[in-house]
From Swiss-Prot:
The lineage of its organism: Bacteria, Pseudomonadati, Pseudomonadota, Gammaproteobacteria, Pasteurellales. This is Sialic acid-binding periplasmic protein SiaP. InterPro entries: DctP_fam, TRAP_DctP, TRAP_DctP_sf. It comes from Haemophilus influenzae (strain 86-028NP). The complex comprises the extracytoplasmic solute receptor protein SiaP, and the fused transmembrane protein SiaT. Keywords: Periplasm, Signal, Sugar transport, Transport. Residues 1-23 form the signal peptide. One of its GO terms (biological process) is transmembrane transport.
Length: 329
């Protein structure tokens, strides 16, 4: 939210207050779901610091982690009405408004982060989505970052897709995650995230799927001794700014914000890439056995789900899927 300072400045000068202690010209807010120990927060801190430095103190960004301002849907609405300035959202999250955007979370459709970038910025589908974010939702996309890839932990080794059969797999209550479990032959078991550790510990479920950072943060490795690198859903994170905020900034400060967001996204991506490499070593030291099943049968098992997606989303969904599949290696 823009903070108007002209009146304050005039008043301060009349009272003899030094300009050195005056507030920034633009006092902005960045809301996010992630907590203070997360890579997202660390990258947002870097973003805020660079913006302040490069704007010579004209822009001050305060961070609001841990869903203090609501969930991601609520924060996107706040960006639209101008009551919040910045937030994060995954590309797939825009399925809330455009069902075809769920393509970003279809298991095995986005094979790596390079594909994720091309899917968003190079395909006609991606370019159109960015335009709709701007026109319909009142948000400008500043940059995209890698945010981890979902893997599968279990109480038995997963060496091939055959080992998934009958596995009671905890998943969030989201269509794409439920579909992953269902079509690879597991038994999907939706459950609140806060309940997962105990469910794994008591064998109420046999496994779960999450990015490696979440596996470590929640200490699932204490109660699951097998980790299969299933690479089934790649997550990204978009740096978003309210159009109302962005358009009120002078052109030179818009560039400061844009450049800082791109730099923060690179740092964000590095944190996750380096972190995932380190975490594999960490889990091995904790006695977790890492397996690398052949993923070709996993992807092949998703064909019925892709057909279901196309049926639900029509020509837009079909076009999105074809365009992204065309850039997969």
């Amino acid at each position: 939210m823009m903070k108007l300072t002209k009146l304050f400045l005039a008043t301060a000068i009349s009272l003899g207050v030094s300009s050195a202690v005056l507030a920034a010209d633009y006092d902005l807010k960045f809301g996010m779901n992630a907590g203070t120990s997360s890579n997202e927060y660390k990258a947002a801190e870097m973003f805020a610091k660079e913006v302040k430095e490069k704007s010579q103190g004209k822009i001050e960004i305060s961070l609001y982690p841990s869903s203090q301002l609501g969930d991601d849907r609520a924060m996107l609405k706040q960006l639209k009405d101008g009551s919040l300035d910045f937030t994060f959202a995954e590309s797939a999250r825009f399925q809330l408004f455009y069902p075809e955007a769920a393509v970003f979370a279809l298991p095995y459709v986005i094979s790596n982060y390079n594909v994720a970038q091309k899917a968003l910025f190079d395909t006609e589908f991606g370019k159109d989505l960015i335009k709709k974010m701007d026109k319909d939702l009142g948000v400008t996309l500043l940059s995209q970052a890698y945010n981890g890839t979902r893997q599968t932990t279990s109480n038995r080794a997963i060496n091939s897709i055959a080992d998934m059969k009958g596995l009671k797999l905890r998943v969030p209550n989201a269509a794409t995650n439920l579909a992953y479990a269902k079509y690879v032959g597991a038994s999907p078991t939706p459950m609140a995230f806060s309940e997962v550790y105990l469910a794994l510990q008591t064998n109420a479920v046999d496994g779960q799927e999450n990015p490696l950072a979440a596996v470590q943060a929640q200490k699932f490795y204490e109660v699951q001794k097998f980790l299969a690198m299933t690479n089934h859903i790649l997550n990204d994170q978009l740096y978003l700014v309210s159009n109302e905020t962005y358009k009120e900034l002078p052109e030179d400060l818009q560039k400061v914000v844009k450049d800082a967001a791109e730099n923060a996204a690179k740092y964000h991506t590095k944190l996750f890439v380096d972190g995932e490499k380190d975490l594999v070593t960490f889990f091995e030291k904790q006695g977790v056995k890492i397996t690398h099943p052949d993923l070709v049968p996993f992807k092949a098992s998703m064909k019925p789900y892709y057909a279901e997606f196309v049926k639900q989303t029509g020509q837009k969904g079909e076009a999105a899927l074809k365009q992204i599949e065309a850039i997969n290696p």
